[in-house]
């Protein structure tokens, strides 16, 4: 264990040393590194898929549920998507060096801010191997060194991805030490990593509630956490039924194992008799289990093919990460807002309505990182928000909120232009 701890410290030291030349690397050089990464992924597809297959087989042998297994799978289509996102990050404007908030003082001093990298970012994450590429690419683009620590369930995939990323960075003339990967999945090493505040500037955990809580409780370093998603869709009394069905279906079914998938459907009592059978019929085709309150049960009890069970108090405020939806009929928008305020996690909330006043109340009163009107909750995503990709979706209010892109992993320094002024 002592040797492993020393290796962690050495990786952090190397990342800190590499962060300095990376901080002032040219945009062209950083973009070249990202394009190299994307091409390396495509050129080494068979090896990546083979490594991922090992992860899949080990996950199946350990009894991982199919819904969770989906999170770690890389197939050819997903690999091409990861490469595409990396090319997209390369095409984004470089935030580093941006000058803003410039003002001329009465004494003639010109004072403003210049955007700079944070330095070294440690990313601790679970399940999805695409996160290895997304986070490394975003950190490099923003001039930050990165220390990657993925979960044991994707160790084979993450190992080859990190190796290819380092090769691509070095080919672009940047220090490969700017990307560090921790192969050892012992959690005790994470605890040690979280104490290296002299070498690491920010920790970003991505994963379940247990991981995020552990990092927050044990870190000596500032943490921006990608929080859990207890996500609601509220169907208002005068919603367009076809839109509401499509949004509720997409929010739940399109990819149920991710944090922006809907967990609870709130339905106004006036539209429930028409809307609920319609959405239940669509959900039944996808195998969605409905955990319904008493009012919803009465409406849906004769719906053919519907997986219907009574909701329990524990179902409200639960992140299912599966084809399960809690359904509640509410008397008013006020009741829906109160329910979300009590049970929501501050991630994403959506209203389906044709009433402008209702939409504005929802936007104003719901406290969440992303609040939507007539749109699927699945859009809360870095690529969908035009960020290229994301480091995570923060449910905090400091230092970043919502999908974290390039600007969220930079800081600024004050710059002052004078012409000989002295303070009297």
Curated annotation (Swiss-Prot):
Its EC number is 1.2.1.41. InterPro entries: Ald_DH/histidinol_DH (IPR016161), Ald_DH_C (IPR016163), Ald_DH_N (IPR016162), Aldehyde_DH_dom (IPR015590), G-glutamylP_reductase_CS (IPR020593), Glu-5-SA_DH (IPR012134), GPR_dom (IPR000965). GO terms for molecular function: glutamate-5-semialdehyde dehydrogenase activity; NADP binding. It comes from Dehalococcoides mccartyi (strain ATCC BAA-2100 / JCM 16839 / KCTC 5957 / BAV1). GO terms for biological process: L-proline biosynthetic process. It is found in: Cytoplasm. It is an enzyme of class 1 (oxidoreductase). It catalyses: L-glutamate 5-semialdehyde + phosphate + NADP(+) = L-glutamyl 5-phosphate + NADPH + H(+). Belongs to the gamma-glutamyl phosphate reductase family. This is Gamma-glutamyl phosphate reductase. It comes from the Bacteria. The gene is proA. Keywords: Amino-acid biosynthesis, Cytoplasm, NADP, Oxidoreductase, Proline biosynthesis. Its main location: cytoplasm. GO terms for cellular component: cytoplasm. Pathway: Amino-acid biosynthesis; L-proline biosynthesis; L-glutamate 5-semialdehyde from L-glutamate: step 2/2. Catalyzes the NADPH-dependent reduction of L-glutamate 5-phosphate into L-glutamate 5-semialdehyde and phosphate. The product spontaneously undergoes cyclization to form 1-pyrroline-5-carboxylate. PROSITE patterns: PROA. CDD domains: ALDH_F18-19_ProA-GPR.
């Amino acid at each position: 264990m002592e040797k492993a701890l020393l290796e962690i410290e050495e990786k952090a030291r190397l990342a800190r040393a590499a962060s300095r030349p990376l901080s002032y690397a040219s945009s062209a050089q950083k973009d070249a590194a990202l394009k190299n990464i994307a091409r390396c992924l495509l050129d080494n597809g068979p090896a990546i898929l083979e490594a991922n297959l090992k992860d899949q087989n080990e996950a199946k042998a350990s009894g991982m549920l199919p819904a969770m297994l989906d999170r770690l799978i890389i197939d050819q289509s997903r690999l091409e998507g990861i490469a595409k996102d990396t090319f997209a990050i390369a095409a984004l404007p470089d935030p580093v060096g941006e000058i803003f908030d410039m003002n001329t003082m009465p004494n003639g001093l010109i004072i403003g801010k210049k955007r700079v990298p944070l330095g070294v970012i440690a990313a601790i994450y679970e399940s999805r191997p695409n996160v290895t590429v997304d986070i490394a690419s975003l950190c490099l683009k923003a001039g930050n060194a990165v220390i990657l620590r993925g979960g044991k369930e994707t160790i084979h995939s993450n190992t080859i991805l990190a190796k290819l990323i380092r090769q691509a960075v070095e080919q672009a003339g940047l220090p490969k030490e700017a990307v560090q990967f921790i192969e050892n999945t012992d959690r005790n090493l994470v605890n040690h990593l979280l104490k290296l505040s002299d070498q690491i500037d920010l920790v970003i955990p991505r994963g379940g509630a247990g991981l995020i809580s552990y990092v927050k409780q044990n870190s000596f370093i500032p943490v921006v956490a990608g929080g859990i998603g207890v996500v609601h869709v509220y169907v208002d009394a005068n919603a367009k039924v076809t839109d509401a069905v499509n949004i509720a279906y997409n929010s739940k079914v399109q990819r149920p194992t991710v944090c922006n998938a809907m967990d609870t459907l709130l339905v106004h009592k006036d539209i429930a008799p028409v809307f609920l059978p319609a959405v239940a019929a669509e959900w039944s085709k996808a195998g969605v289990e409905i955990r319904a309150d008493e009012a919803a049960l009465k409406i849906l009890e004769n719906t053919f093919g519907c997986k219907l069970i009574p909701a329990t108090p524990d179902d409200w405020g639960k992140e299912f990460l599966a084809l399960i939806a809690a359904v509640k009929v509410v008397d008013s928008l006020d009741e829906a807002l109160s329910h979300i305020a009590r049970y929501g996690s501050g991630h994403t909330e959506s209203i389906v309505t044709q009433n402008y006043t209702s939409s504005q109340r929802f936007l104003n009163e719901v406290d969440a990182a992303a609040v939507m009107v007539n749109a699927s909750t699945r859009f809360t995503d870095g690529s969908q928000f035009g960020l290229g990709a994301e480091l995570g979706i923060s449910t905090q209010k400091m230092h970043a909120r919502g999908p974290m892109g390039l600007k969220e992993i930079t800081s600024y320094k004050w710059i002052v232009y004078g012409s000989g002024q002295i303070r009297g």
